[in-house]
Amino acid sequence: MGLFGKTQEKPPKELVNEWSLKIRKEMRVVDRQIRDIQREEEKVKRSVKDAAKKGQKDVCVVLAKEMIRSRKAVSKLYASKAHMNSVLMGMKNQLAVLRVAGSLQKSTEVMKAMQSLVKIPEIQATMRELSKEMMKAGIIEEMLEDTFESMDDQEEMEEAAEMEIDRILFEITAGALGKAPSKVTDALPEPEPLGAMAASEDEEEEEEALEAMQSRLATLRS
């Protein structure tokens, strides 16, 4: 506390160093999320291969869509890392300016990067907090609340799924699936005949496993 109970402002250099530390911490969080999603994707690939061997086209399609969602999430996380690197570079520049001018300067590069970062759900809270601190320090201007994802995101995902599903299945099954989705069952091995009760139990177990896998992927992406 300063005189008369007022909070003393931190020196600009200390602020910049604190922001840099927070950003590096968030980058490590993003790295972990990317690794978790990619590990789960490997499990999905194995499930696609198993489903293809059993002739379960519908299961393959559902899993392929999950992979598309996961890859899209990973792509966004990599983009967020690039933006965080831009902010870190901006912080280095601020320290250089501080040594010469004695004060922090407004930065359009940092502003643009932070505008993108506050839209990433995984790091949104921290980035909003940093944005407020940077606005107070005069590095960036007040940002408008235009941080909502496109309302057409789900629709775009479905369209992308239709476009990418052949490629994903072809890639995972080494050509057994993917060229013609409406005809893939013709090229798939016939499932081994099972008793009615055994087949029903297997289907229930597979459905439960599929739902569990979808739930894990959704949790990692949220």
From Swiss-Prot:
N-myristoyl glycine lipid sites: G2
Gene Ontology, cellular component aspect: amphisome membrane; cytosol; ESCRT III complex; kinetochore; kinetochore microtubule; lysosomal membrane; midbody; multivesicular body
Membrane disposition: Lipid-anchor
Residue segments, region Interaction with VPS4A: 151-222
The protein, known as: Charged multivesicular body protein 3
Underlying gene: CHMP3
Phosphoserine found at: S200
Annotated site (Important for autoinhibitory function): V48
GO terms of molecular function: phosphatidylcholine binding; ubiquitin-specific protease binding
Similarity field: Belongs to the SNF7 family.
Region of interest called Intramolecular interaction with C-terminus, as start-end residue ranges on this chain: 2-113
One Pfam family here: Snf7
